[in-house]
Swiss-Prot record:
Pfam families: Mqo. Its cofactor is FAD. This is Probable malate:quinone oxidoreductase. It comes from the Bacteria. Residues 535-562 are annotated as: Disordered. SUPFAM superfamilies: FAD/NAD(P)-binding domain (SSF51905). NCBIfam families: mal_quin_oxido, PRK05257.1-1, PRK05257.1-4, PRK05257.2-1, PRK05257.3-2, PRK13339.1. Gene3D superfamilies: D-Amino Acid Oxidase, subunit A, domain 2, FAD/NAD(P)-binding domain. Its EC number is 1.1.5.4. Pathway: Carbohydrate metabolism; tricarboxylic acid cycle; oxaloacetate from (S)-malate (quinone route): step 1/1.
Length: 562
């Protein structure tokens, strides 16, 4: 008996020590090489995706004498979520995504989020237009193409919801031109594949926005990065992985990087560090050791799509058609049948289907999730899991899907589809934010968030959606937070040349909407609609009363996306 108790005690002690090691080891700071540059560079960008490259493009124009270095662990730019095949949310402008316009308890439609995202996408168009005019981006048709956006629903309740959504949105200049119909013949004209083979007794409705676009962020990222390298003050380091971040007493940072070709490590001193590493940003934020990092954790979710490349199909579907999540399913499950242009070809993608993975990057490690767990966030992550049982069940169910199950979902949006028409492709990884709320403790937060240290010397972008589509707007926010002095001393004036609407809300005025859209449509070879003043005065966005959302332990649930 005594021997058994001794063995049990030993096991308990061993388990406790192993648990402590597991929770504290990720934050252990090992010794690293000293910086090999006495004079710090101005900026280090971590990650070769759309965010880092967009920020670098801004900085190179605003402060061309600054020395900028970018480190990417893979052997090329834009190989993770910025790549066209890995980026599910292309051309996000809130024209079709129904989760951005939730119906409130009183039956009204909240459109505040949709208007904000639509304005952010207009800023993206301004930014890309500026780069095209200055030769930093190729012919617009190589990265952005007119692709109408549709919302498509069936069932009386959903049809009524879509009607109310349409009525609320078209009062705003940014949504002028959106059409609504319950006529199957009209909807079939918009999107033949949605309607052919559908039973005649099924009531359907759709909205159609002719100003929608499809965007290839891989092309944008690679071409902007190519232009950045034209400057002697910019250096790109591929096959280099950041392994440590240490702040010096003078508030500069030593960034330790490993050359993956030879295994050698070195450190570089920098005045400012931006972590734009997609899903890996959380782990790098934790490596920095800044107090703000203790308030965050992450939850990875992968995505898969059915890909159609047969021209007999792709030439008959030139829209992005978004549906509505099934009853009881999380908003991230919103299905869409997307017309895309990838690798110079027309493609149609249907999905997403969630993919369980513990990786934070498509080319990451299966240990990514576990190595991000520490004594600061472990209990909170368990609490978030308990408060999101429906989401956990959904992901578990998705993990068991067969090809027959996926095809059954496809038939709801493409009734005449055949299993031989498609192949299953895996997209990029998304890491949803788990953060500490002062009132609720750890919560699951959707959308993106900039995390910055109190000295404004290190910034990280966490989260996923809408992500790339609003990258110029997100990086504008970062510039304002990280470099307030420079903004006051000349940057704001220069930014108005890059973003003519800077400091204004495009949706506030039909005249401003027309001015900006006319300019970007001409530069980007996109369709344009003149907004008449009398019919498109901006509506006061409906804002949900705070108590309507008080029962949830999540934040920004309408921003869920794969």
């Amino acid at each position: 008996m005594k021997k058994s108790l001794k063995e049990l005690t030993g096991l308990i002690v061993a388990f406790a020590l192993a648990t402590l090691l597991f929770l504290y080891w990720p934050l252990y700071q090992r010794s690293v090489p000293k910086a090999n540059n006495d004079a710090p560079v101005d900026v280090v960008l971590i990650g070769g995706g759309i965010m880092s490259v967009t920020l670098g493009t801004y900085l190179q124009e605003l402060q061309p004498d600054w020395k900028i270095e970018l480190f990417e662990r893979l052997n090329g730019i834009a190989q993770e979520s910025s790549d066209g095949w890995n980026n599910a949310g292309t051309g996000h402008s809130a024209f079709a995504e129904l989760n951005y316009t939730p119906e409130l308890q009183d039956g009204t439609i909240e459109i505040k989020r949709a208007i904000k995202i639509a304005e952010q996408f207009e800023i993206s168009r301004e930014f890309w237009s500026h780069q095209v005019r200055h030769g930093r981006l190729p012919a617009p048709t190589e990265f952005i193409n007119a692709t109408p956006h549709m919302s498509f629903v069936w069932g009386e309740d959903r049809i009524e919801y879509l009607r109310k959504r349409h009525n609320a949105l078209i009062k705003n200049p940014l949504f002028y031109g959106m059409q609504f119909s319950t006529d199957p013949a009209i909807i079939q004209k918009w999107a033949p594949l949605l309607m052919e083979g559908r039973t005649q007794d099924q009531k359907v409705a759709a909205t159609y926005m002719p100003l929608g676009t499809d965007v290839n962020f891989g092309v944008i990222t690679r071409d902007l990065a190519k232009h950045l390298q034209d400057s002697q003050n910019f250096a790109l380091h591929l096959d280099h992985e950041v392994t440590a971040l240490r702040q010096n007493p003078d508030k500069t940072w030593n960034v330790t990087v490993k050359d993956l070709n030879n295994g050698q490590e070195r450190s570089i001193k920098s005045r400012f560090v931006f972590i734009g590493a997609g899903g890996a940003a959380l782990k790098l934020l934790q490596l920095s050791g800044i107090p703000e990092s203790k308030d965050y954790a992450g939850f990875p979710v992968g995505g898969q799509f059915l890909s159609f490349e047969n021209t007999a199909i792709t030439k008959r579907h030139n829209v992005k058609a978004y549906g509505m999540a099934e009853s009881g399913s999380p908003p991230m499950s919103v299905p869409h049948l997307d017309a895309r242009k990838l690798d110079g070809k027309s493609i149609v993608l249907f999905g997403p289907f969630a993919l369980y993975s513990t990786k934070f990057l498509k080319n990451g490690s299966w240990f990514d999730l576990y190595s991000s767990v520490n004594h600061h966030n472990a209990a909170g992550m368990l609490s978030v899991g308990k408060n999101n049982i429906d989401l956990v069940k959904y992901l578990m169910k998705q993990a068991t899907l067969t090809d027959a199950d996926r095809h059954a979902e496809l038939l709801k949006y493409f009734p005449n589809a055949k299993p031989t028409d498609w192949t299953l492709v895996t997209a990029g990884q998304r890491v949803q934010i788990i953060k500490r709320d002062p009132d609720k403790g750890m919560i699951l937060q959707f959308g993106t968030e900039i995390v910055m240290d109190k000295d404004h010397t290190l910034a990280t972008l966490l989260g996923a959606s809408p992500g790339a589509s609003t990258s110029p707007s997100i990086m504008l926010d970062l510039l304002a937070k990280a470099f307030p002095q420079q903004m006051k001393n000349g940057w704001e004036t220069q930014l108005k040349k890059i973003i003519p609407s800077y400091g204004q809300h495009i949706n506030d005025s039909p005249a401003l909407t027309n001015k900006i859209r006319r300019m970007t449509s001409e530069t980007l070879s996109l369709p344009y609609l003149e907004v008449p003043d009398k019919s498109a005065t901006p509506a006061d966005p409906t804002i949900a009363p705070k108590n309507q959302h008080s029962t949830t332990y999540n934040a920004n649930s309408e921003m869920q996306a794969l």
